[in-house]
């Protein structure tokens, strides 16, 4: 009975793709990197964190990571006005939300450019695998350490004027709390912002199943389509969290590869590697896609 049910399950088609990955980036570049067997893992760029500050080959060194390589997304141009986002809110918005917004638009554009058919956005949902933590969350938590800094400086014998001046300089390394900070750091708003800015009227939410988050989101999307609750679903995964916190977490477990290479299914495998990336698929029921003349990628 179970096998019969699986056989009769409505086939689902991929009709659009949007992606941002390390290396050559988008859909075409990502495929070329795979086809050519290109290694897109690199040393940690200074834009993320400095090796001099945090790297140590000894895994037992406190507050240091033995990982120095990973997959890092290159800077991506973002026009906030094109998405109706105030430019002065960008600092208070996590990069995962912005990158996902770009990739989602690419997926929708892919549908319209390849089939010339606009989907019904009122019945389009967004379901993404997203980690509960965001880079901005850690950043804003750091700003709240002011009392710790003040106490440490006072205990060092500094005068109050010097204490306050030094703490002010430390605070200047963190962005200020504003009205847009809370939604800007929430993981669930990765999906919510896509629905809001791209005018999608279906469900929107994220799922956190650790390393299986993307597959979890896809599974839920299939159920959504087969139940008839949505006609189109944007599903996939978003991870822009290659900050030092993640490296420290995986180093102290320890789960990171000490040799700096990911070798799945190999006898020489010695750990995992961390990589940023955004991959979003536009999914429809196969019968609907064929009826409406959508280009079917898979």
Q: What function would you assign to each model-found segment?
A:
Residues 2-298:
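Condensing-enzyme catalytic core of the thiolase-fold
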